[in-house]
């Protein structure tokens, strides 16, 4: 009868040393991947919401331009175009996203998208349906931008969304969706075809409002401009 000799198992000290090293390398890879995903995916950054400083933004837009640009004093005109575009990712074309194209008197131009962190500030590239145009002096434009940043820092989808921040009104989308949700909850308790029909009509009206009911944009001047009127076009 022959016996085979098996090699002795590796010492425990070696396995204990190799295991932490392997775990460390895996954890580093996972943390790196999560960091990259957090930077690329705006939905993950909502956990760490960015708080913008309006005064810092105004400093970069306006400060030191009085001395550098000789035509600055004669170019005290700021243009803000508020537009809306269909939401493509969620809700198909039932929902609409509101944004502003801002052209500052110092020559800077950018887009402001409330609730789109970390892409709140973007270059001019979006074509949307213009709702209104604001013609403002520097001081009024600064006040408007401060209000935009304040609204962005307190953004929420229900009561402080992009429509309420830019258009200074109660969100029409929020009102209709709230009514539809309340009727749906009531319909769960006590089913009624009438409530179901009303819900469908609400969704249809929201779809028509964001796609087919197109109102003419209007131009609004601030109080410090020579023309202080609203013009429809």
Curated annotation (Swiss-Prot):
Topology in the lipid bilayer: Multi-pass membrane protein
TM region positions: 171-191, 194-214
One Gene Ontology cellular component annotation held by this UniProt entry: host cell nucleus
Main location class: host cell
Keywords: Host membrane, Host nucleus, Membrane, Transmembrane, Transmembrane helix, Virion
UniProt entry tagged with the keyword Heme: no
Keyword Transmembrane helix appears in the UniProt entry: yes
Disulfide-bonded cysteines: none
Compartment(s): Host nucleus; Host membrane; Virion
Domain of life: Viruses
Function in brief: Plays an essential role in the assembly of nucleocapsids with envelopes.
Protein name: Protein AC81
Organism from which the protein derives: Autographa californica nuclear polyhedrosis virus
């Amino acid at each position: 009868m022959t016996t085979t000799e098996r090699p002795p198992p590796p010492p425990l000290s070696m396995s204990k040393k190799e295991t932490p090293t392997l775990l460390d390398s895996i954890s580093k890879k996972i943390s790196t991947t999560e960091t990259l995903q957090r930077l690329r995916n705006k939905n993950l950054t909502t956990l760490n919401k960015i708080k913008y400083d309006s005064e810092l933004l105004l400093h970069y837009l306006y400060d030191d331009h009085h001395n550098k640009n000789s035509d600055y004093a004669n170019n005290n005109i700021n243009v803000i175009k508020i537009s809306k575009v269909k939401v493509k990712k969620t809700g198909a074309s039932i929902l609409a996203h509101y944004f502003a194209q801002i052209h500052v008197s110092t020559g800077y131009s950018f887009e402001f998208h409330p609730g789109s962190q970390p892409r709140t500030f973007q270059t001019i590239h979006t074509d949307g349906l213009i709702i209104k145009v604001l013609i403002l002096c520097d001081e009024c434009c600064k006040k408007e931008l401060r209000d935009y940043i304040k609204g962005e820092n307190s953004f929420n989808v229900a009561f402080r969304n992009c429509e309420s921040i830019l258009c200074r009104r109660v969100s029409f989308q929020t009102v209709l969706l709230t009514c539809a949700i309340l009727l749906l909850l009531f319909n769960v308790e006590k089913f009624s075809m009438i409530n179901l029909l009303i819900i469908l009509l609400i969704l249809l009206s929201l779809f028509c409002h964001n796609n087919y009911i197109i109102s003419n944009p209007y131009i609004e001047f601030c109080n410090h401009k020579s023309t202080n009127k609203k013009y429809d076009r």
